[in-house]
Amino acid sequence: MKICYRIAQRDWLKDESFEALYRSIEKWKNNIDELALFTGLAHLGHYPVAFARKCAPILKRRIIALKEIGIPSVGVNMWSTLGHVDESWDWVEAPPFQTVVGHDGKTSLGCPCMRNEGVLDYIREIYSIVATAQPDFVWLDDDVRMQHHMVEFPCFCHGCIQKFNRRTGRVLNRERLVKALEAPEQWKLRREFLEFNRQAMLDVCKAAEEGVHSVNPAIRTGIMTTDMAWNSYALSDQEGMLQAAKAEMVRPGGGFYNDETPTLLFHKLHSVSLQSAYAPGIPDNQYELEDFPICRNKSVHIHMIELTGALMAGCNGLALNSVIPNETEALMTAMERIRPMWNRLVKANAGTELRGFCPVYVPQCDGAEFAAHSVFSHVSSENLSNETAPMRMGMAFTPLPENAEVCTICGDMMAAISDEEIPRLFSKGVLMDAEALEILIRRGYGDLAGCRPGTPYHDGLLERYTPHSINGAMAGKERDVFMTFWDREGITVKTLIPQEGAEVLTELFSITGQNVGAGATFFRNHIGGRVAVLSYFAWKHQNTLGKAETVPCLMDALADGRFPVKIDGGTHVQAMLRTGDSGFTLFLTNTSFDATRELHVHIRARCRKATLYDTYGQELPCASEMDEQGNALLRLPALAGWGAYTVIAE
């Protein structure tokens, strides 16, 4: 595995700063495999060419000096290509080309239009200048995306609208184009526009690659990627962007800047697993450890959990922001201590896949025919986030449906699933909400779900668990989220009308005691699948009464008794499981501040020998045996609050 540090330009550009950096790197060089030196002026999208030319010889000297003290690989991270935000416009010359314009007419001060021919020429030039410093590699950062360049949904400048009109044979101005894109019946136009955006991203990546390789074809290129759903406005074509850049490196990132809400880490780890899955064949996969704005926002303890989780999510390297030469003694010491375990974990993970449930994501979700949401929204990201809800009950996850026994589908993500894929998904296990059910019925597949939507209600409902085997001891108990606290205007809960063969898991009651109908159903369909539909706050308030007790049982029932990992002894233990022909790896994190009981972990895999490590990579005793079903059973000591275990099994 590889550990890389990214170094801010302020730490290498001036001699006195570089001397301090040099001393720190000399001290820790045995734990540093790679350095990436930032180039550019802050987050704005224009790196003045004259300044870049002035910096390039200095950059070259720094690279030579760092390699001379034993750093194996030293390269460059372009801070900005298109710009992250408008920043420092009072101090830096304005871009000499068109900046991006939003759908609302708002114009960026410093982020260039990605379709402008002058901009593509500038990108080629600026990357070629950086390449003259002869770095081992050049990273494109995560500003290479359509969205969030100060204006949220670009680009609607005159030039872009003219290009789109020529491409599609239309005559539209900004206002008419925006109105048309918002019309539900204009889904083909939306798809054309999103494809237009996708091509713009490919052109930018290609221009950067051409700039680098015009100087030296041996310089490796890489892209820092972001949450797939953040890029739905350009059809989330991460794989195409990597190919256009001829990338040999990928750096999944996005979010989790501090540990104030530590459970958000697992949303990022799911995102990283998805980004990694859409980077097939890329040999160098480095996790981006975010700590923006580059400060001590996280404890060393959380760093250990986060970085081990990243290796479980599919990365084989770690990229940290410029923590040196700042105060890093405790972190660097902890990383030195845990490194042997990380090395073994990366080796064991080779050839394995994550197993668990899959939150379904379709890159074309914003351009689907039955999608009801605005193309100028973040609904796709919200849907994907909702689909990860079973993670809050500790359920192991996988980014790909083919590696899952159960898939979760939220809202109009259902609209984007292809006609070929629907039977494949619904022949296994599916957990979905009432909104997804309605779209499934509109598409002609309602017979796969076992129910249809009934009467809508806007307030005053709770759900009661029925005496079903899935509910166990929760039978007769009530779950009340006090629904009108959360969205007085927009809340709608619909009853479900079960079809023949469907089993009712919960019933909806008014606060005055009136039974208004089913709130959750379970159904075995005619193609062999198991389907659960939840209509009462399917994805929210997962810690309300009954969820921790019933979700694991429901997921196992949807998997037909084959969910790959079951944990007894703690209701807030998040699992990540990878399996392969030669064994499995398991990562457990207690996401509660209370210790668990002794953990009994059942794994649907064989186990000859298991090695257990604590949060800091120290080996612990581990008892492994086979359970009555012939699967691995691990008996692990009680896990402390916000502690972690890593298991490597052969």
Model-flagged regions — what are they?
Residues 381-382, 387-388, 393, 397-402, ...:
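A conserved amphipathic helix/loop scaffold
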Residues 32-39, 130-145, 318-322, 405-413, ...:
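Short acidic catalytic loops
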Residues 73-133, 169-194, 198:
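Active-site-adjacent "subsite" loops/lids of carbohydrate-active enzymes
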Residues 1-58, 87:
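N-terminal substrate-binding region of glycoside hydrolase catalytic domains
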Residues 32-36, 58-106, 137-147, 218-222:
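Glycine-rich, aromatic-flanked loop segments that form ligand/cofactor-binding clefts
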Residues 28, 33, 38-41, 136, ...:
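Hydrophobic targeting/anchoring helices
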Residues 140-189, 226-230:
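Active-site-proximal loop/short-helix segments
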Residues 5-18, 108-122, 291-300:
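Active-site mouth loops of central-metabolism enzymes
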